[in-house]
């Protein structure tokens, strides 16, 4: 039964990826944000997000923050099919790098460093940009629970984000 569920999920996600590829980056990103805000709480535990916000001593409107968290995940999901365009600089206007001089120093001195990122905006782009700067990079990736989707995502990550996963 789990295999059927994974296959159905795979077909649905592949369909969405096809739509996102056809409608372009900006539309995909905006629709992904809307879908994430709308559907995210159905597929993920909204209460665990709120509990984590409380543990982190985040103040504010938990409902709004949670809604934006799900929206952000939806946006990242929808942008996956456009990673190739980030890699080949067709979407570089959406990326800003603060502290590029540190990357230049790391490359020049061949220092070994560890970069830490959170799930802020499209967090996948960090490893891509580090690798594009000519720095030998490896990324840690938790495999998806769906083996069909994981195979596709791993291929996309290796091709467009960072060769070493």
Region spans (language model):
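Membrane-anchoring hydrophobic helices of lipid-metabolizing enzymes
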Residues: 1-117, 150-155
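Catalytic core of membrane glycerolipid acyltransferases/transacylases, capturing the structured
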Residues: 111-165
